[in-house]
């Protein structure tokens, strides 16, 4: 599995709707009643971040880590939020290692539509177990 391309045919619904402007789902989930977290796949909230399962995952365990503040670029994110994001990346890769024993991870963010960002206005990290 580790040398396979990152393509998941079940993501086609997402790919076909990426040009629709329905607002920022991360801000919507951030502002929603925490009682709706399971419906929104939110697994944890922090003072500066929100963590959730990807609704259209490449692999099992595909997570998103995002700052609470709507920011398109790293220089728009506070130091506290960046530190919390990096801490959560570390914590969740550790949890995923313990629970699903992946061979590795793809971890990253896409800044801007040209870089492949499906939501270019609100940066977020992907953790994709491989």
Give, region by region, the residue ranges found by the protein language model.
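HIT superfamily nucleotide-processing domains
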Residues: 1-130
């Amino acid at each position: 599995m580790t040398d396979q391309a990152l393509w998941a045919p079940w993501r086609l619904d997402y790919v076909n709707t990426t040009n629709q402007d329905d607002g920022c789902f991360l801000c919507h989930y951030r502002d929603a009643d925490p009682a709706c977290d399971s419906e929104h796949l939110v697994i944890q909230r922090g003072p500066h971040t929100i963590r959730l399962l990807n609704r259209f995952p490449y692999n099992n365990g595909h997570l998103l880590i995002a700052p609470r503040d709507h920011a398109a670029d790293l220089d728009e994110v506070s130091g506290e939020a960046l530190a919390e994001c990096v801490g959560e990346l570390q914590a969740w890769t550790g949890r995923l290692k313990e629970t699903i024993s992946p061979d590795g991870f793809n971890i990253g963010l896409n800044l801007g539509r040209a870089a492949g960002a499906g939501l270019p206005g609100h940066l977020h990290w992907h953790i994709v177990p491989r």
